[in-house]
């Protein structure tokens, strides 16, 4: 019986070392050598302090900042552990709402958000990414159209000209990967940090 168990135990130990230690350390080493910023989480620092990651959105609510996409992430309700409560951009619980297009809760939320945005900028159609959540709930990017839609509100709150803000948005548009993959996008955190650095 020991002769039968021994090979199985050897394989468990061998593959535990191989897949649990050697492979992760090797991949981390390769990532740090080839993509040092990405291997550390694409962290953004200002004055020696980490202010966020270029890969994870943040919940900006002040009129002085550009807002990201709605986030459907949640956290445990402190009053009832069997329930959850909204916690926008909670990276510990990344997920979409899983509500289908005919779900009344989703329809009501989108209508409410769209009406609030339309009141903010009645002359422009509301970009779809300002009322829809991403699959992860942590999307750090907006379409250039969604960022430009918010220019009047941010300009008014900061006392800046709309033209200056449009230029700032244009400077922060990231193109398609390799010229063909994905869509042009704006990283909301990078744009808001540039706003703060403008001094107004």
Curated annotation (Swiss-Prot):
Localisation per UniProt entry: Cell inner membrane
InterPro entries named in the record: KdpC
Family: Belongs to the KdpC family.
This protein's encoding gene: kdpC
Primary location: membrane
Name assigned to this protein: Potassium-transporting ATPase KdpC subunit
Transmembrane segments: 7-27
Pfam families registered for this protein in UniProt: KdpC (PF02669)
Keyword Transmembrane helix: yes
Lipid bilayer topology: Single-pass membrane protein
Record keywords, A-Z: ATP-binding, Cell inner membrane, Cell membrane, Ion transport, Membrane, Nucleotide-binding, Potassium, Potassium transport, Transmembrane, Transmembrane helix, Transport
Main function: Part of the high-affinity ATP-driven potassium transport (or Kdp) system, which catalyzes the hydrolysis of ATP coupled with the electrogenic transport of potassium into the cytoplasm. This subunit acts as a catalytic chaperone that increases the ATP-binding affinity of the ATP-hydrolyzing subunit KdpB by the formation of a transient KdpB/KdpC/ATP ternary complex.
Gene Ontology cellular-component annotations: plasma membrane
GO molecular function, one term: P-type potassium transmembrane transporter activity
Assembly information from the UniProt record: The system is composed of three essential subunits: KdpA, KdpB and KdpC.
Positions in coiled-coil regions: none
């Amino acid at each position: 019986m020991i002769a039968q168990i021994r090979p199985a135990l050897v394989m468990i130990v061998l593959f535990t070392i191989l897949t649990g230690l050697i492979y992760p350390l090797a991949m981390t080493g390769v990532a740090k050598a080839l993509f040092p910023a990405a291997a550390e989480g694409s962290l953004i620092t200002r004055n020696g302090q980490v202010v966020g990651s270029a890969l994870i959105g943040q919940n900006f609510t002040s009129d002085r900042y550009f807002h990201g996409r709605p986030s459907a992430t949640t956290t445990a309700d402190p009053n009832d552990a069997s329930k959850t409560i909204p916690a926008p951009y909670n990276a510990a619980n990344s997920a979409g709402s899983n509500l289908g297009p005919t779900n009344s809760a989703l329809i009501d939320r989108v209508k409410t958000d769209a009406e609030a945005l339309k009141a903010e900028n009645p002359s422009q159609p509301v970009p779809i990414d300002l009322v829809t959540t991403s699959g992860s709930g942590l999307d750090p990017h907006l379409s250039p159209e969604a960022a430009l839609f918010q220019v009047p509100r941010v300009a008014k709150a900061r006392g800046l000209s709309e033209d200056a803000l449009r230029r700032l948005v244009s400077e922060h548009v990231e193109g398609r990967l390799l010229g063909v993959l994905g869509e042009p996008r704006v990283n909301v955190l990078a744009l808001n940090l540039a706003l703060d650095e403008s001094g107004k």
